[in-house]
Amino acid sequence: MPTIIPLLQKVRSGLPFRIGPRPSGPDYQITPRYRVAFLTGCIQDELFRGVNADTVSVLARNGCEVIIPEHQKCCGALHAHVGERELSRQLARSNIAAFEATGADYYIVNASGCGATLKDYAHLLHDDPKYSQRAAQFVAKLRDFAEFLVEVGFEAPAGRIEARVTYQDACHMKHGQKVFLQPRVLLKSIPGLELVEMKDSDWCCGSAGIYNVVQPVMANEVLSWKVENVSNTKASILVASNPGCTIQINFGMEKAGQPLEILHLAEILERSYRLAEEAPA
């Protein structure tokens, strides 16, 4: 990992960061149906705090008391990508303990790369006599943000968003977590939104964890196919649920001279909720 950090620092400029205050509770009253613990992530927390804030808000709007575990750690995905398996196992143990302490009904994650890693904890710790069963119980409570909302039932947003929108199926979301219908259910619930499927929406964008950092030439070749497919949809908004995809596709679209707005699913849902609230009576 130390060799990766300088490379990551080189790609910071020009990225669609949405840095703000860390999420806290909503500024409106809710009647909770569920108590959920939320993993804020590393890249998501440092570079896309607005995404996390909107995630908390949408969850609260849908009857959740949201807890952010104080002692949560990195999920361990990047460590696993570079072969630091034992460190990844240590992080898994720490997260399991931190989330268990909340007493939450569900554990929620909004970044597909983190989610795929968290859902692998039972396999990662299968031979750990102290944590194998706890890891299995952790995974049983874990849900992706979209997966959770569709499973428990959500309040459809009422604010109109007149836009042509396409959705990026992150590799770790569709192939790793098998979550692909739920984001579309949520998007189709937004009034005025036209969802246009891109060709090969589940093809890798070239981010692939840290692949675009350690193998930028090959990653950019993969990215060129994604840029073409996004462009062909004529969408003005792309929705993605992984920070790596957001960063990579934003880079490709800007380089191609075809910038477009890239939003997380939580952001576009929260936008619709707020538009309805702000509409004149």
For the regions a language model picked out, list residue spans one by one.
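Iron-sulfur cluster-binding electron-transfer modules in prokaryotic oxidoreductases
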Residues: 1-281
